């Protein structure tokens, strides 16, 4: 009954009536004067709290972020996170409706009994730019003589201070002696410009035009494309071939054009988008009605269609396919409630999160989404370094169909569109458990205006099965539950919604889970069933998942940039390959299991396909556990999933996409730390002609032995469509892990006792 005040129809009317009469017999007083009363339900919901009524216990439960409150009508106390709190004014009932004092929210939720949110006394140097700082950066940039009217903003984000200084702050509390600085990326027409702005001294430190770069697709480009399509008489005429007479019912999806060395007939220096379209039939799912074999090429500078590419006319699939369940009667499901009656086990201080032995900083970036920084683990009082920064590096969704409406489709979702900008607000109780704390985040829009995204990130703790268990005959059972802290973020890029979870285990493991849901991009075909004459040809590149609709085979490939600092920055990549070796020690066995251990000493050697039967470690060979083993973290790019694993790029080596985006084909990369090397696809991948990302970073083959190394893991799935994913796709996951390997001296959760 969250988000609503409801009373069960069970026969408790007499008890409730008595409570109502007793509670409203006379005026209610607070501090010697008559209290001003307001409706509990409306007031608390406007505050953002869930309101629940327990008809049996005659009690309200109020939940807001870290506060879990129980209060009975007429009672002089409430229970807040398991502790008693005196109420200046009790909850009263009148005519079946609950009323509270207008000071109730302050009395209860500002009582200090909820310790989830703490005041940040020393701002973390990696805190996101505030709304005021974003506005200041824009003001400074606009005052520059080089700034041109109508310039748009691709990104306004924190320019990070020196890494060593940030670690000194996180570990010793040493203040960072540097002004707050912003990176500003702009689009002046089709020209990309980078600026670095000193916010404290209100001056521009650098102003750099970037030659040959194509900027991101911005949100107003979507509006421009729709207007161009709607007002084009040429496009309207072509639509008639497809039986469409009203261009106003056509929904466009602007897509980047890729790079084909001129074989697609497109001018390389132009700012172009390809547009595929769908018909809005009124069923709420225009994705089910593709206008197949029709592509408009739009010049964003000229604001016009410069080319229309066509194939054979395929009738638009017209069968209604709503995905919101409007035409289904699903069975009613009883509530499943997750409660934390004594409050949260974690605290949030500014943007720093503390849970169990973990501490980390969290901020949202407009391109890659959440960035987790200064990740440490408290090992018996010693704060140990694990990771300086971890984030999505980039991702790509390439399709395998060569037809006119598909051959160019290879979506670089973060690099071309900005996945942080496309953050989807999280709905508590649906997108995240009901016990989640939702965090708002502020980024800049394309005009430079600060924009706050409500519920951008969810934080929650969950039960995750037994941490360990053993039952010895004749002795008591020994077991404890596993808890996980999840940082969840969702980005909606066109038809797909991507869920990213950073999962902290109390045993030192970090999970990275990438989930894909939403609606598949589908192709209109002639075949209704696999028995139709055209079915074999229609399904050459995909699966018939509905009448006249094929789900085209594609991949979801994710890359994560993980600047691991395992007990410090001098790390080495170590391989351990379990092998079968002959038995030379005697006895009946002819073979043994042994481990071949060796160092991988350079960037080129580190770029590898992942073999799940082997072990790859980032080790600090100068630090040992008590047995003398070097402390390490295991890197597992693919630890399971629900779709076939993407073991590499499903493209021939002579494809341009293969050469532009090397990160797709190998699951493990390790490079030397350089602060400007942040994106596996390169900083400006839109229409890039060669690899400016990981392939370039590793080209100089720097040494990795006892250096500050950055791990990049590529994971994902090859998506072969099935009927059960249409018209909306259940979330499909790819899982990765970072796992302590001789990092500790013993089972790190030994002796844990959880209530």
Swiss-Prot record:
The active site is at 413 (proton acceptor), 496 (schiff-base intermediate with substrate). GO terms for molecular function: copper ion binding; primary methylamine oxidase activity; quinone binding. PROSITE patterns: COPPER_AMINE_OXID_1, COPPER_AMINE_OXID_2. GO terms for cellular component: periplasmic space. Its EC number is 1.4.3.21. Ca(2+) 1 binds at residues 563-565, 708. Gene3D superfamilies: 3.10.450.40, Copper amine oxidase, catalytic domain (2.70.98.20), Copper amine oxidase-like, N-terminal domain (3.30.457.10). It is an enzyme of class 1 (oxidoreductase). SUPFAM superfamilies: Amine oxidase catalytic domain (SSF49998), Amine oxidase N-terminal region (SSF54416), Copper amine oxidase, domain N (SSF55383). Ca(2+) 2 binds at residues 603, 697, 700, 702. It comes from the Bacteria. Residues 1-30 form the signal peptide. Topaquinone (TPQ) is generated by copper-dependent autoxidation of a specific tyrosyl residue. The modification 2',4',5'-topaquinone is found at residue 496. It is found in: Periplasm. GO terms for biological process: catecholamine metabolic process. Its cofactor is Cu cation; Zn(2+); Ca(2+); L-topaquinone. InterPro entries: Cu_Am_Ox_Cu-bd, Cu_Am_ox_TPQ-bd, Cu_amine_oxidase, Cu_amine_oxidase-like_N, Cu_amine_oxidase_C, Cu_amine_oxidase_C_sf, Cu_amine_oxidase_N-reg, Cu_amine_oxidase_N2. Belongs to the copper/topaquinone oxidase family. Active on tyramine, tryptamine, beta-phenethylamine and dopamine. Homodimer. This is Primary amine oxidase. The gene is maoA.
